[in-house]
Amino acid sequence: MLSPKKVKHRKVFKGRMRGAAHRGSSLAFGDYALKALSCGTMTARQIEAARITINRTMKRGGQVWIRVFPDKPLTKKPAETRMGKGKGSPESWVAIVKPGRLLYEVAGVSEDVAIKALSLASNKLPFPCKVVTRRTTL
């Protein structure tokens, strides 16, 4: 699973997801991309599940770029624990996704294969997404 090698703080504030994505909203590497339409969090497991789906659909042809990284720790208290007594210990890592953020980019395959792979990957994610091409973004 994806996770940072070293972090400055073990636990972070929850934060609020407001506004659209400024960085990571334009095609940089591939010809086709999966774009988030609403805000949410992507766990490291969801990122990996969607990546595997894309690779299997493309039959290992072409190239895939992952444009998000889970850099925020998600904490959880143990089961059957009373409230209080501090914040729980870090359990997993999530990536904060805002509307307009590109999640995956694909190149080296035909258009119908790329669109099929990215749309199947969007089913693995907890928020709505759409497939964009270099032609539609210009």
From Swiss-Prot:
One of its GO terms (cellular component) is cytosolic large ribosomal subunit. GO terms for biological process: translation. SUPFAM superfamilies: Ribosomal protein L16p/L10e. The keyword Cell inner membrane does not apply. GO terms for molecular function: rRNA binding; structural constituent of ribosome; tRNA binding. CDD domains: Ribosomal_L16_L10e (cd01433). Keywords: Ribonucleoprotein, Ribosomal protein, RNA-binding, rRNA-binding, tRNA-binding. Pfam families: Ribosomal_L16. Gene3D superfamilies: Ribosomal protein L10e/L16. InterPro entries: Ribosomal_uL16, Ribosomal_uL16_bact-type, Ribosomal_uL16_CS, Ribosomal_uL16_dom, Ribosomal_uL16_sf. It comes from the Bacteria. Part of the 50S ribosomal subunit. Binds 23S rRNA and is also seen to make contacts with the A and possibly P site tRNAs. Belongs to the universal ribosomal protein uL16 family. This is Large ribosomal subunit protein uL16. It comes from Desulfotalea psychrophila (strain LSv54 / DSM 12343). The lineage of its organism: Bacteria, Pseudomonadati, Thermodesulfobacteriota, Desulfobulbia, Desulfobulbales.
